[in-house]
Amino acid sequence: MAFEEAIKRVFMKKICMKCNSRNSWKATKCRKCGYTNLRPKAKEARA
């Protein structure tokens, strides 16, 4: 894929389930609220 670096930069994030902030891929807790339930950023578009 031609834009693999760009895709990694955009999608290699984790989203806090409590406050929806973006966190680094290696994060174990949210940088804003400290919540530990993080999900990977969705790679597929919603319907």
UniProtKB/Swiss-Prot annotation:
The lineage of its organism: Archaea, Methanobacteriati, Methanobacteriota, Methanomada group, Methanococci. Keywords: Ribonucleoprotein, Ribosomal protein. It comes from the Archaea. One of its GO terms (biological process) is translation. One of its GO terms (cellular component) is ribosome. Belongs to the eukaryotic ribosomal protein eL40 family. InterPro entries: Ribosomal_eL40_arc, Ribosomal_eL40_dom, Ribosomal_eL40_sf, Ribosomal_zn-bd. One of its GO terms (molecular function) is structural constituent of ribosome. This is Large ribosomal subunit protein eL40.
